[in-house]
Protein backbone atom coordinates (compact mmCIF):
# COMPACT_ATOMS: atom_id res chain seq x y z
CA UNK A 1 0.00 0.00 0.00
CA UNK A 2 2.94 2.37 0.52
CA UNK A 3 3.78 2.15 -3.18
CA UNK A 4 0.26 3.28 -4.04
CA UNK A 5 0.92 6.52 -2.17
CA UNK A 6 4.34 6.80 -3.85
CA UNK A 7 2.70 6.62 -7.29
CA UNK A 8 0.14 9.23 -6.22
CA UNK A 9 2.87 11.44 -4.65
CA UNK A 10 0.76 11.62 -1.48
CA UNK A 11 1.43 11.08 2.19
CA UNK A 12 0.53 7.73 3.66
CA UNK A 13 -1.96 8.11 6.54
CA UNK A 14 0.68 6.91 9.03
CA UNK A 15 2.83 9.91 8.06
CA UNK A 16 -0.09 12.22 8.73
CA UNK A 17 -0.95 10.46 12.01
CA UNK A 18 2.60 10.92 13.35
CA UNK A 19 3.16 14.39 11.89
CA UNK A 20 5.89 13.42 9.42
CA UNK A 21 5.90 16.12 6.74
CA UNK A 22 7.25 13.94 3.92
CA UNK A 23 6.17 11.89 0.93
CA UNK A 24 7.44 8.62 -0.50
CA UNK A 25 10.66 8.99 -2.46
CA UNK A 26 10.92 7.68 -6.00
CA UNK A 27 14.18 6.57 -7.58
CA UNK A 28 14.47 4.45 -10.73
CA UNK A 29 16.63 1.90 -8.83
CA UNK A 30 14.38 1.66 -5.76
CA UNK A 31 12.95 -1.74 -6.75
CA UNK A 32 16.52 -3.12 -6.98
CA UNK A 33 17.50 -1.47 -3.69
CA UNK A 34 14.59 -3.23 -1.98
CA UNK A 35 15.57 -6.75 -3.10
CA UNK A 36 17.47 -9.10 -0.82
CA UNK A 37 20.90 -9.96 -2.27
CA UNK A 38 20.68 -6.90 -4.54
CA UNK A 39 20.02 -3.91 -2.33
CA UNK A 40 21.62 -0.51 -2.37
CA UNK A 41 25.39 -0.91 -2.32
CA UNK A 42 28.63 0.99 -2.12
CA UNK A 43 32.31 0.01 -2.07
CA UNK A 44 34.23 1.20 0.97
CA UNK A 45 37.24 3.40 0.13
CA UNK A 46 38.84 1.14 -2.48
CA UNK A 47 39.06 -1.83 -0.11
CA UNK A 48 36.96 -4.27 -2.15
CA UNK A 49 34.60 -4.33 0.82
CA UNK A 50 31.11 -3.84 -0.55
CA UNK A 51 28.48 -2.75 1.95
CA UNK A 52 24.88 -3.28 0.96
CA UNK A 53 21.42 -3.71 2.34
CA UNK A 54 17.86 -4.06 1.13
CA UNK A 55 16.07 -0.89 2.19
CA UNK A 56 12.34 -1.27 2.74
CA UNK A 57 11.39 2.29 1.88
CA UNK A 58 12.65 5.81 1.40
CA UNK A 59 10.72 8.97 2.12
CA UNK A 60 11.70 12.54 1.33
CA UNK A 61 11.24 15.83 3.17
CA UNK A 62 10.39 19.01 1.28
CA UNK A 63 14.01 20.18 1.69
CA UNK A 64 15.24 17.13 -0.28
CA UNK A 65 16.56 15.10 2.66
CA UNK A 66 16.05 11.35 2.12
CA UNK A 67 14.56 9.44 5.07
CA UNK A 68 15.41 5.76 5.58
CA UNK A 69 12.41 3.64 6.59
CA UNK A 70 12.33 -0.01 7.59
CA UNK A 71 9.33 -2.26 8.22
CA UNK A 72 9.20 -4.74 11.08
CA UNK A 73 6.42 -7.05 12.18
CA UNK A 74 5.92 -9.24 15.21
CA UNK A 75 3.30 -10.35 17.68
CA UNK A 76 4.47 -9.02 21.03
CA UNK A 77 2.67 -9.80 24.24
CA UNK A 78 3.34 -9.51 27.94
CA UNK A 79 1.76 -12.18 30.15
CA UNK A 80 -0.19 -13.35 27.07
CA UNK A 81 -1.82 -9.93 26.72
CA UNK A 82 -1.33 -7.71 23.69
CA UNK A 83 1.45 -5.20 24.27
CA UNK A 84 1.51 -1.99 22.26
CA UNK A 85 4.78 -0.86 20.72
CA UNK A 86 5.11 2.83 21.58
CA UNK A 87 8.86 3.46 21.35
CA UNK A 88 12.17 1.69 20.91
CA UNK A 89 12.12 0.58 24.57
CA UNK A 90 9.23 -1.73 23.64
CA UNK A 91 11.30 -3.40 20.91
CA UNK A 92 13.75 -6.28 21.38
CA UNK A 93 16.89 -5.04 23.20
CA UNK A 94 15.73 -1.43 22.90
CA UNK A 95 15.86 -1.66 19.13
CA UNK A 96 19.67 -1.41 19.14
CA UNK A 97 20.12 -3.73 16.16
CA UNK A 98 17.35 -1.96 14.20
CA UNK A 99 18.90 1.44 14.88
CA UNK A 100 22.27 0.20 13.60
CA UNK A 101 20.59 -1.22 10.51
CA UNK A 102 18.94 2.13 9.77
CA UNK A 103 22.25 3.96 10.29
CA UNK A 104 24.11 1.63 7.91
CA UNK A 105 21.46 2.34 5.26
CA UNK A 106 21.85 6.07 5.92
CA UNK A 107 25.63 5.78 5.51
CA UNK A 108 25.32 3.83 2.24
CA UNK A 109 22.97 6.42 0.76
CA UNK A 110 25.20 9.25 1.98
CA UNK A 111 28.23 7.60 0.34
CA UNK A 112 26.23 7.30 -2.87
CA UNK A 113 25.86 11.09 -2.82
CA UNK A 114 22.35 11.46 -1.47
CA UNK A 115 21.30 14.20 0.92
CA UNK A 116 20.30 12.02 3.88
CA UNK A 117 18.21 13.07 6.87
CA UNK A 118 19.32 12.12 10.38
CA UNK A 119 15.68 11.13 10.94
CA UNK A 120 14.82 7.54 10.15
CA UNK A 121 11.78 5.43 11.00
CA UNK A 122 10.57 1.95 11.77
CA UNK A 123 7.05 1.14 10.64
CA UNK A 124 6.32 -1.45 13.32
CA UNK A 125 3.36 -3.80 12.83
CA UNK A 126 2.37 -5.74 15.93
CA UNK A 127 -0.21 -8.52 15.46
CA UNK A 128 -3.01 -8.93 17.95
CA UNK A 129 -2.92 -12.38 19.59
CA UNK A 130 -5.97 -12.09 21.78
CA UNK A 131 -8.63 -12.85 19.16
CA UNK A 132 -10.81 -15.91 19.66
CA UNK A 133 -10.39 -16.88 16.01
CA UNK A 134 -8.09 -15.61 13.30
CA UNK A 135 -10.06 -16.86 10.25
CA UNK A 136 -6.85 -16.62 8.18
CA UNK A 137 -6.56 -12.91 8.93
CA UNK A 138 -4.08 -11.20 11.23
CA UNK A 139 -4.95 -7.75 12.52
CA UNK A 140 -2.06 -5.44 13.34
CA UNK A 141 -1.50 -2.30 15.34
CA UNK A 142 0.91 -0.20 13.28
CA UNK A 143 3.22 2.27 15.02
CA UNK A 144 5.80 4.64 13.60
CA UNK A 145 9.01 4.80 15.64
CA UNK A 146 11.43 7.66 14.98
CA UNK A 147 15.18 7.37 15.45
CA UNK A 148 17.68 10.19 14.97
CA UNK A 149 20.50 8.30 13.33
CA UNK A 150 24.23 8.86 13.63
CA UNK A 151 26.27 6.84 11.15
CA UNK A 152 29.64 8.29 12.23
CA UNK A 153 30.59 4.89 13.72
CA UNK A 154 30.23 2.94 10.45
CA UNK A 155 33.57 3.78 8.81
CA UNK A 156 35.54 2.98 11.97
CA UNK A 157 33.96 -0.47 12.12
CA UNK A 158 34.66 -1.05 8.43
CA UNK A 159 38.32 -0.05 8.91
CA UNK A 160 38.56 -2.53 11.81
CA UNK A 161 37.00 -5.25 9.63
CA UNK A 162 39.42 -4.49 6.80
CA UNK A 163 42.43 -4.64 9.13
CA UNK A 164 41.23 -7.93 10.62
CA UNK A 165 40.65 -9.51 7.21
CA UNK A 166 44.16 -8.51 6.13
CA UNK A 167 45.85 -9.64 9.33
CA UNK A 168 47.66 -12.92 9.84
CA UNK A 169 46.45 -13.13 13.43
CA UNK A 170 43.18 -14.70 14.50
CA UNK A 171 41.48 -12.69 17.25
CA UNK A 172 40.50 -14.25 20.55
CA UNK A 173 36.91 -15.41 20.75
CA UNK A 174 34.51 -13.42 22.86
CA UNK A 175 32.23 -14.74 25.58
CA UNK A 176 29.57 -12.37 24.16
CA UNK A 177 29.63 -14.10 20.76
CA UNK A 178 27.28 -17.08 20.39
CA UNK A 179 28.92 -18.15 17.14
CA UNK A 180 32.38 -18.06 18.76
CA UNK A 181 31.21 -20.48 21.43
CA UNK A 182 29.73 -22.80 18.82
CA UNK A 183 32.93 -22.79 16.75
CA UNK A 184 35.08 -23.37 19.83
CA UNK A 185 32.88 -26.29 20.93
CA UNK A 186 32.90 -27.78 17.40
CA UNK A 187 36.67 -27.51 17.21
CA UNK A 188 37.04 -29.39 20.50
CA UNK A 189 34.77 -32.17 19.22
CA UNK A 190 36.18 -32.61 15.76
CA UNK A 191 39.82 -31.55 15.84
Model-derived features with residue positions:
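Mg2+/Mn2+-dependent nuclease catalytic core
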Residues: 33-156
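A non-catalytic, helix-rich entry segment at domain boundaries
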Residues: 1-40, 44
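Accessory terminal regions of nucleic-acid processing enzymes
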Residues: 7, 11-12, 21, 31, ...
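A residue-level signal for conserved active-site and pocket-lining positions in enzyme catalytic cores
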Residues: 2, 105, 180
Amino acid sequence: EFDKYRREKKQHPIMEKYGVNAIHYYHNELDIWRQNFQGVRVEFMGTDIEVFGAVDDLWIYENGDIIVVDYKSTSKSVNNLFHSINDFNDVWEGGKIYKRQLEVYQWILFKKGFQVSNDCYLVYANAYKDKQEFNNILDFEVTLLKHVGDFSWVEGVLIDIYKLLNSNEVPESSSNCELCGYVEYSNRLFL
